[in-house]
Amino acid sequence: MSVLEKPKKTAEQDWHRADILAELKKNGWSLRSLAKEGQVSYNTLKTVLDKSYPKMERLVANAIGVPPEVIWAGRFAERNKRPTLQHKY
C-alpha cells in the first residue's frame, strides 16, 4: 500500500472562534464580562481563542455549559498524545 492509498485519520476539530463567541453571547456573556466575573484581565481571557490556556478554557467552557474537551478537541488530543517509541538501530 502506498502513502497515497492510506486512509487519513480524522482529527477532531476545535470550534471556530466565532462559534465560541456566539455561544457565549447566547448564554448572556461577553468576553469582557466573563473576564470580570472570573477576575482575570480581558487580554488574558482573549488568548484562549488562539492559544492553549487550560484555566481560561475551563472558564469559557463553564460559561457555555460544554466541556472544554468538546470545544477544543484538537488541543486536548495534542495534550493527551503519547509519543511512539521507535528503535534507532
From Swiss-Prot:
Molecular function (Gene Ontology), one example: DNA binding
SUPFAM superfamilies xref list: lambda repressor-like DNA-binding domains
Alphabetized Gene3D superfamilies for the sequence: lambda repressor-like DNA-binding domains
Superkingdom in the source lineage: Bacteria
Alphabetical list of Pfam families matching this protein: HTH_35
UniProt keyword terms in alphabetical order: DNA-binding, Repressor, Transcription, Transcription regulation
DNA-binding region of this protein: 57-76
Function according to Swiss-Prot or TrEMBL: Negative regulator of transcription starting from the Pe and Pc promoters of Mu. Also negatively regulates its own gene transcription.
Record-stated family: Belongs to the ner transcriptional regulatory family.
Descriptive protein name: Mu-like prophage FluMu DNA-binding protein Ner
Species this protein is from: Haemophilus influenzae (strain ATCC 51907 / DSM 11121 / KW20 / Rd)
Gene: nlp
